[in-house]
Amino acid sequence: EGRFWNLSLLPAQWSPGAIDAPDPPVDVAAVNPWMLRMAGEVADGVHVHPLNTPTYLRETVLPNVAEGAASAGRSRSDLQLLVPCFTAVGDDGAEQERWRELARVQVAFYGSTPNYGFVFDQIGFEGTTARIRERQKAGDLAGMAAVISDDILEHFVVTATWDDLAERLAARYDGIADRVVAYFAGAAWTADPASLQRWQPVAADVRGRA
């Protein structure tokens, strides 16, 4: 039962009754300041959008989540902050470049959303979303990705060898994220199930640095 909804109309055969377990955590996905404040006020965790930069995390996410938490008598540490990250990881430059190009396409795709344009503005690339949308309206998918220059891409992607990846992730997200999600790990695993063995020590290393 809540302020707006009363979920009580449930046939007996489908009702689980009382559950002898703690309430599951409720996370909220948020991008803009209002949603981030709301998440900080009421949620157990915040799922950050994949279109994120260190600047966005520090200047938009952290202060707004903290403000929302404070309004409810809580602190930022009462919430889990889950941050996805585009990684371009490989043993050589060619492998890294393949993932960088996939990241470029994803940044352009997400960056075409008007409400997300401020993320580019924060890092000095004003008008990026408008340029992406021009190419989008023309049906030029390659042109959309081309708007994301290497200088822009650097703000969104961690490029590393497997040996360096954990250190770079820790340096980027230390003091910001409670959990880091490797955005492309699933795609890598689907293409090559053996790649999972390479992600496991990276995850263990990052956790060990927390």
What is the predicted role of each segment?
Residues 1-210:
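Active-site-adjacent structural elements that line small-molecule/cofactor binding pockets in enzymes
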